[in-house]
Amino acid sequence: MRMLYFSKHLALTCIGLAAIFATNAQAVEQIKPQVDASALPALGWHEPNPLRGNAEAAAIGKAAFNQSCAVCHGQDAIGTRSPAPDLRRIGMGCRRIQDAALRQRCQGDADAFFIKSVRYGKQKFGIVHMPPWEGLLAPELAWALRSFVETAPKGTGIQSLSPTAAATQ
């Protein structure tokens, strides 16, 4: 009898929490970034990232990120204290792969995961964890975001707050 009472209350609590999280997750307003992306070449949604290593694309991506993505993923992609995942971790393990062909394949998989998440968003059990951005972001701007995230400083984010780190950047 006591177990049934506990199970009933646990189920009601879970339903209540799911409703709260669903409301909060869907409450994030999508803001289309207002950046000049005219320097970027017209691209499609293909992988791997065609703008990898392009410093100008990374700078455009940083501006767009801080306008549209930082509210969930942290300013300058420093997502260690943010409600959403730290995007700098996507493909992090690829850097340790010694074989160039395998490393390139790993980066391609990470690019595919990133771009699919941006285009279609993330939804689990009816809860929107990330809204879809297809239609709001052009493919070239999405790839610029990826280029920025790949070049964003790694670490805890605490270093970026120190005056010494800011002076060396």
Residue ranges and their predicted role:
Residues 1-6:
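N-terminal secretory signal peptides that target proteins for export/translocation
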Residues 11-20:
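Bacterial N-terminal signal peptides
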Residues 27-32, 81-89, 117-152, 157-169:
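Axial heme c-ligation environment in periplasmic c-type cytochrome domains
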Residues 31-64, 168-169:
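Electrostatic cytochrome c docking/interface patches
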Residues 54-78, 114-116, 145, 162-164, ...:
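Sequence/structural segment immediately N-terminal to covalent heme-attachment motifs in c-type
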Residues 58, 62, 74, 78-119, ...:
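Gly/Gly-Pro-rich "capping" loops immediately C-terminal to redox-active cysteine motifs
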